[in-house]
Amino acid sequence: MTNIRKTHPLMKIVNNAFIDLPAPSNISSWWNFGSLLGICLILQILTGLFLAMHYTPDTTTAFSSVTHICRDVNYGWIIRYMHANGASMFFICLFMHVGRGLYYGSYTFLETWNIGVILLFATMATAFMGYVLPWGQMSFWGATVITNLLSAIPYIGTNLVEWIWGGFSVDKATLTRFFAFHFIFPFMIAALAMVHLLFLHETGSNNPTGIPSDTDKIPFHPYYTIKDILGAILLILVLMLLVLFTPDLLGDPDNYTPANPLNTPPHIKPEWYFLFAYAILRSIPNKLGGVLALILSILVLVIMPLLHTSKQRSMMFRPISQCMFWILVADLLTLTWIGGQPVEHPYIIIGQLASIMYFLIILVMMPVASIIENNLLKW
């Protein structure tokens, strides 16, 4: 009798995706982040569900309902901090996952890559709306500043902003709709992630060499299931270290002050994982220009396959491109640092230079480095 996992309509899908899936024999730990993102998403949905049971999306009670969760609900504090720090872990895994894709040329799987970019945008939108929900000072002013950016759109901008707000300022209507969207988006992300996986399994995984591995495949289970479990243990270890020892390390102290429309905080800044994009936004003196640069800083990922001028897929055997890649990483870290600093000298000029460098490396230096390497191969 054939095994049920190979015949049952539902089990067959699971089997082909996680058990009998042919995987390259040489994929490194950089390939762990996909499964870690899945774990993060499940964790966020579960903790979020339990938080939603006690949260009230109303301007008068939102802040106190979060306090109530932390003080009065059984293990509410751990659920709240797992959700808040889980978002940070989610973005760490996301950045690693995207970085891996850039380094090893995984963006040549066009459909998988483009859905990945959509997933990145959806996750960023979800995180932004979630940050508004506790209704602290940074929640309110973050929502005001970021939604206000849409007013830079010519002609329809102002109407669009007021439509999103549901009034003439960030208020009760805004909070209620953000809660509704924050609840539904993760399920859309889960659906998109399944499509992401579907397209990936059409081609099979890439590997560090970038060379087709059809001649050397191994079953996903037990080899990569055990490897993914190790990754998951480390992820949960780091998350719980954050939650139990320094739960507020990555948060903003201003968010422990209830939202007050009459009092602007001295430094309005988003969560750490948006600081690089925020720095790019602030580095352009023009409002519309800044908004475009902000969107393009992420959207540039879509054209990565067009910018691939190398004859090799991966950067494994391309030292000049490797150099460019790590300069880009350093540049992103610089932008992240600048995004958290006040708008004054010397931070303004550093931010502007880092922003120019960001686009210059991706659009010019990396493709040129690839062409140089192609020519070096002829020698």
UniProtKB/Swiss-Prot annotation:
One of its GO terms (cellular component) is respiratory chain complex III. It comes from the Eukaryota. One of its GO terms (biological process) is mitochondrial electron transport, ubiquinol to cytochrome c. Binds 2 heme b groups non-covalently. Its cofactor is heme b. Signal peptide: none annotated. The keyword Cell wall biogenesis/degradation does not apply. Heme b b562 binds at H83, H182. The chain crosses the membrane at residues 33-53, 77-98, 113-133, 178-198, 226-246, 288-308, 320-340, 347-367. A ubiquinone binds at H201. It is found in: Mitochondrion inner membrane. One of its GO terms (molecular function) is ubiquinol-cytochrome-c reductase activity. Keywords: Electron transport, Heme, Iron, Membrane, Metal-binding, Mitochondrion, Mitochondrion inner membrane, Respiratory chain, Transmembrane, Transmembrane helix, Transport, Ubiquinone. Pfam families: Cytochrom_B_C, Cytochrome_B. The keyword Transmembrane applies. It is a multi-pass membrane protein. Gene3D superfamilies: Cytochrome Bc1 Complex, Chain C. Heme b b566 binds at H97, H196. Belongs to the cytochrome b family. Heme 1 (or BL or b562) is low-potential and absorbs at about 562 nm, and heme 2 (or BH or b566) is high-potential and absorbs at about 566 nm. The cytochrome bc1 complex contains 11 subunits: 3 respiratory subunits (MT-CYB, CYC1 and UQCRFS1), 2 core proteins (UQCRC1 and UQCRC2) and 6 low-molecular weight proteins (UQCRH/QCR6, UQCRB/QCR7, UQCRQ/QCR8, UQCR10/QCR9, UQCR11/QCR10 and a cleavage product of UQCRFS1). This cytochrome bc1 complex then forms a dimer. Component of the ubiquinol-cytochrome c reductase complex (complex III or cytochrome b-c1 complex) that is part of the mitochondrial respiratory chain. The b-c1 complex mediates electron transfer from ubiquinol to cytochrome c. Contributes to the generation of a proton gradient across the mitochondrial membrane that is then used for ATP synthesis. This is Cytochrome b. It comes from Ovis dalli (Dall's sheep). The lineage of its organism: Eukaryota, Metazoa, Chordata, Craniata, Vertebrata.
